[in-house]
């Protein structure tokens, strides 16, 4: 399947401008067009163009809740699997990821992040699969900043091993 996308991305920039003794803040907004090919590679196809600053939407995403369909033994297994995986993930190669993840689901990131914790994992069983919605907290070794990433995954157990399949 050959899928391609084009996205328009609006972003804003705050600049602190100093001229002699005077300092002022200038707030500007721009829009760019980004082309994404079927493998996830991206390229800007339109230079940043001035635009108005969009208003915040009233949209409120529906909170995902546990349906109580995953027992405590399975929850502990998945917690252990995900903790192991997310400790390895930042520095793992594609070959190493293949033991934990179906091809291309999560790509190597090549960063020196130190795993901190799984935050609010929510597990729900659907047939022989478990859907997972969670946040993962890392410390970036270069900046010492906390890196927080959200993941929505589908796990499946083959034999005694869990694997991320979506």
How would you name each of these model-derived features?
Residues 8, 22, 41, 47, ...:
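Detector for Asparagine
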Residues 1, 54-110:
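Core segments of small alpha/beta cavity-forming domains
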Residues 17, 31, 45, 50-53, ...:
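Weak global preference for isoleucine
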Residues 95, 103-107, 126-130, 160, ...:
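Generic structural signal for short, solvent-exposed loop/turn connectors between secondary structure elements
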Residues 1-20, 112-152:
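Surface-exposed, charged secondary-structure patches
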Residues 20-67, 150-166:
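Short beta-strand edge/turn micro-motifs at domain boundaries
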Residues 13, 34-36, 86-89, 155:
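Hydrophobic, Leu/Ile/Phe/Ala-enriched alpha-helical segments that form helix-helix packing faces
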């Amino acid at each position: 399947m050959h899928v391609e996308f084009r996205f328009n991305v609006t972003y804003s920039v705050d600049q602190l401008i100093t001229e002699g003794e005077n300092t002022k803040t200038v707030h500007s907004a721009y829009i760019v067009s980004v082309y994404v090919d079927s493998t996830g590679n991206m390229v800007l196809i339109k230079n940043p163009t001035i635009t108005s600053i969009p208003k915040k939407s009233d949209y409120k995403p529906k909170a995902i809740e546990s349906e109580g369909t995953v027992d405590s033994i399975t929850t502990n297994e998945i917690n252990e699997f995900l903790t192991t995986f997310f400790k390895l993930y930042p520095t793992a190669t594609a070959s190493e990821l293949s033991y934990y993840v179906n091809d291309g689901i999560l790509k190597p990131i090549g960063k020196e992040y130190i795993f901190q914790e799984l935050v609010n994992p929510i597990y729900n069983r659907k047939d022989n699969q478990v859907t997972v919605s969670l946040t993962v907290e890392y410390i970036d070794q270069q900046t010492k900043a906390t890196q927080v990433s959200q993941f929505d995954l589908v796990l499946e157990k083959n034999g005694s091993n869990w694997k991320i399949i979506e």
